[in-house]
């Protein structure tokens, strides 16, 4: 079968002969989607020009030589226009250590005054080979059975709050290096996902949690505040409940072995570890270095890392904009 015998195709699909054959076998189908047919056809030709002759590709795609060269010039001009945008996308991606996908880069560009379609951001990131990191899950549990006082689940997975300090969340997570382990105990505000305060310790003891409470809740009274946790032994301890009672804070606990009940903390720990720990463990030379990196990340998370659910703002920006 010669080239002239091939059936011309609709704008939706094209049919190409297999390399080195006359097209007797079933040919690969390639979709022509988006933008103009001539522009997309030109892009396909540029992708396949090393495998087939230009004349063959032009005939199969029903594209004149003059139109092809015109589109090549247009694409080159468009590439020049996109160069500055690609450099900015790369800069944002690098600034956030490869943790931003196209959605958050789109929001960050909007915050900087650039109005660009999110699909274009996605397309340019693909060309640049930029992909956001995938989160890994590894759960640390401090549960040691029913050894103290428990509390009802007052949250029931209704995590969001209408104002700061209405619903707060806490938990402990573990970081393991060859030298030893660190334990992070933060308090997160359900209003804007801000880390109110935190402690880092070499051991997950009661002193760490007591210090965390004192740092996160320094005022005399917090009437109307709920502090939700899992059923870890620290949160069943009498001193924990005594502190909350004195501050007017109501305790709330997840059901036994049900980590999604504390989804706000689970989400934060997942973000934290995927963005500054998993895959980077060997880069930390000591526990002191890791501890400083955790503190630096939490500052970054609160003040710079934008969240889609906060309208493209960081937790502190969202709180400041809402309450001044």
Name each region found by the language model.
Residues 2-324:
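Charged DNA-binding/catalytic regions of mobile-element recombinases
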């Amino acid at each position: 079968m010669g080239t002239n015998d091939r059936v011309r195709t609709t704008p939706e699909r094209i049919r190409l002969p297999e390399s080195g054959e006359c097209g007797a076998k079933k040919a690969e189908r390639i979709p022509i989607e988006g933008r103009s047919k001539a522009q997309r056809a030109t892009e396909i030709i540029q992708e396949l020009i090393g495998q087939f002759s230009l004349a063959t590709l032009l005939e199969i795609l029903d594209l004149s030589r003059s139109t092809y060269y015109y589109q090549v010039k247009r694409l080159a001009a468009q590439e020049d226009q996109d160069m500055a945008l690609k450099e900015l996308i790369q800069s944002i991606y690098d600034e956030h250590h490869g943790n931003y996908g196209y959605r958050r880069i789109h929001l960050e560009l909007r915050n900087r005054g650039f109005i660009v379609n999110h699909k274009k951001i996605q397309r340019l990131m693909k060309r640049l080979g930029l992909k956001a990191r995938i989160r890994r899950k590894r759960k640390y549990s401090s549960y040691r059975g029913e050894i103290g006082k428990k509390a009802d689940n007052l949250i029931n997975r209704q995590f969001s709050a209408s104002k700061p300090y209405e619903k707060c969340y806490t938990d402990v997570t573990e970081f393991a290096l060859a030298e030893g382990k660190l334990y992070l105990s933060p308090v997160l505000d359900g209003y804007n996902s801000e880390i109110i305060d935190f402690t880092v310790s070499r051991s997950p003891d009661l002193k760490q949690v007591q210090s965390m409470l004192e740092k996160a809740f320094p005022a005399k009274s917090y009437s109307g505040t709920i502090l939700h946790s899992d059923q870890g032994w620290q949160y069943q301890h009498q001193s924990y409940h005594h502190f909350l009672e004195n501050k007017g804070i109501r305790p709330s606990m997840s059901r036994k072995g049900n980590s999604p009940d504390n989804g706000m903390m689970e989400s934060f720990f997942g973000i934290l570890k995927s963005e500054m720990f998993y895959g980077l463990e060997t880069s930390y030379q000591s526990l002191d270095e890791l501890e400083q990196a955790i503190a630096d990340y939490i500052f970054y998370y609160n003040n710079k890392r934008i969240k889609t659910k906060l309208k493209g703002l960081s937790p502190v920006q969202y709180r400041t904009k809402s309450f001044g």
